[in-house]
């Protein structure tokens, strides 16, 4: 499975499919017009709900199987289905890889009007500087494919869910490409991470075929409550860590002009002077480039107030940074 993913990734990069697919959806004059049309707009807004609800339903379904003699043999299959989406989609894709891979989205790269450099799928960059790899929305589309886990119980159900997931996940992937939010390889790896997670849980952790013939022995109610409380606590802790230790990156660039005979500058700022570095531009237009990185809650950012107020003989540059939201840590460099 890993070799297949690496081979597909190599082919996508060698043939230029990632950039070519984005070029197909991009218009230099309009941006990403396809992404604003239906059904792509609807899929972006509501497309994750079916997969999320099915994943959510897997936990109470597992408790039901634990207490039902008829469905007792299916308990581990149901548990694997739920955990694959929680671990693969929730933790590995959205909490770890997306936040730390540092791959800019198509709409953020220079080729499509952005300011960041394009990176290949496995060419990891600065954490927080782009959250393209893998595609989070796509994992919820492909999550139906995890139903292949039920092959031993019902081949019709398993194959139906698998192909439904492939179709729906591909549909979500196309929607995200049309919106300039993801490359094709981001969708491929969304499916890949889910299948890798499923394989580990199935073959190395739970091994459900070995438990099918076990006698019916329902878990005591007290033990079930403890287990359920433990799962809730673990999810609460992971959510807290995710939202407070989420990598953050934002930059600001601005070109400006100075009087030809200016020999000095006066800088007015609320940033520490140790954060500034002067770089010779070899005759190019003066430019200020501010980078901010750290850890912050979702939807947190900063606003940069840059101006050149008129003064006497010495040119003045005014640069102030205003934080919007909660930063657990923020380091700036100008």
Q: Predicted regions: what is each one?
A:
Residues 242-266, 271-334:
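Acidic (Asp/Glu) and glycine-rich low-complexity loops/linkers
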Residues 67, 174-179, 245-246:
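Juxtamembrane "helix-exit" motif on the non-cytosolic side of transmembrane helices
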Residues 119-227:
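Membrane-embedded catalytic cores of phosphoryl/pyrophosphoryl-handling enzymes
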Residues 75-91, 219-246:
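Internal/C-terminal transmembrane anchor helices
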Residues 56-65, 199-207, 239-242:
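Alpha-helical transmembrane segments
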Residues 1-130, 139-167, 172-173:
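Hydrophobic alpha-helical bundle signature of multipass membrane enzymes
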């Amino acid at each position: 499975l890993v070799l297949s993913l690496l081979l597909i990734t190599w082919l996508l990069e060698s043939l230029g499919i990632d950039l070519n697919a984005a070029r197909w959806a991009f218009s230099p004059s309009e941006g990403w017009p396809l992404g604003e049309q239906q059904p792509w707009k609807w899929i972006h807004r509501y497309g994750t709900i079916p997969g999320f609800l099915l994943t959510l339903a897997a936990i109470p379904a597992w408790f039901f199987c634990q207490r039902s003699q008829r469905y007792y043999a299916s308990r581990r299959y149901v548990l694997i289905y739920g955990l694959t989406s929680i671990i693969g989609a929730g933790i590995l894709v959205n909490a770890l890889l997306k936040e730390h891979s540092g791959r800019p989205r198509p709409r953020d790269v220079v080729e499509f009007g952005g300011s960041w450099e394009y990176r290949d799928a496995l060419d990891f960059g600065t954490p927080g500087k782009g959250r393209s790899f893998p595609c989070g929305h796509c994992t919820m589309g492909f999550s139906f494919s995890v139903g292949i886990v039920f092959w031993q119980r019902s081949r019709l159900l398993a194959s139906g869910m698998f192909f439904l997931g492939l179709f729906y996940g591909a549909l979500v992937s196309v929607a995200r490409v049309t919106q300039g939010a993801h490359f094709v390889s981001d969708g491929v790896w969304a499916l890949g991470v889910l299948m890798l997670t499923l394989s580990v849980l199935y073959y190395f952790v739970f091994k459900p075929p070995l438990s099918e013939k076990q006698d019916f022995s329902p878990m005591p109610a007290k033990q079930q409550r403890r287990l359920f409380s433990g799962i809730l606590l673990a999810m609460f802790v992971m959510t807290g860590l995710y939202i407070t230790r989420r990598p953050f990156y934002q930059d600001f660039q601005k070109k400006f002009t100075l009087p030809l005979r200016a020999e000095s500058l006066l800088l007015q700022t609320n940033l520490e002077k140790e954060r500034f570095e002067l770089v010779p531009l070899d005759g190019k237009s003066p430019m200020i480039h501010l980078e901010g990185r750290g850890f912050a809650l979702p939807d947190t950012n900063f606003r940069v107030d840059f101006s050149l107020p008129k003064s006497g003989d010495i040119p003045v540059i005014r640069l102030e940074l205003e934080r919007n939201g909660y930063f657990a840590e923020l380091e700036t460099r100008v």
